[in-house]
Amino acid sequence: MKYAKTLQAALIARLGNKVEFMPGWDKQRRVPWQPNGVPVALLFHHTAGAATESTNSKHPGNQKGANRGVINFVQNHYEVPAANFTLDRDGTVYVHSAFPVWHAGKGSFKGVKPFDTLGIPKDMGNDYMLGVEVVSKGRKRDFTHAQKVSLGKLANACKDASGWKGFWKRLPNHRTWTSRKVDTRYSLTALRSWATLYR
């Protein structure tokens, strides 16, 4: 349970009032983090469902609570949450679990540099990587500015809590893990740039 407390402190320090902890977030529902009790990366997903794909901060679909149904689905639809975090369009990060959940599915980083150096066995991504679901329809690059800022801060909080030295091999897309997926629509360079820019 030590990692949960460390992660909580890091998230609050980085995100302030833009983080909310869901019921049971600190409960270990599956195995501990592999291989050494902390995750080795943060895997990026999009929900493929959202109230809007407008990036206008004043749009009703980008206000807090507008996508509560999506957040509740990630939290409650399966036996364990479908991601560790959901990032709403207003920039709020909802923490579902500090421990391994089911989000990565089958896949492999074999031959995929630099992620092949993480040592994640085939189809075992759930036990090694945190996952964040970004609320987005996923048809185009529609992340809001608030989401990009919070993604950067979330990545830094995960780095702080997990002891990563940097971001080069720590922020893969879901499609980096498996060719079955298209998320996210953003490049690895973009993801890394937000982590560097928004701390």
Q: Where does each model-flagged region fall?
A:
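N-terminal catalytic cores of peptidoglycan-degrading enzymes
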Residues: 1-123
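Basic/polar, cationic surfaces and motifs that engage anionic cell-wall
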Residues: 1-23, 32-36, 123-131, 135-199
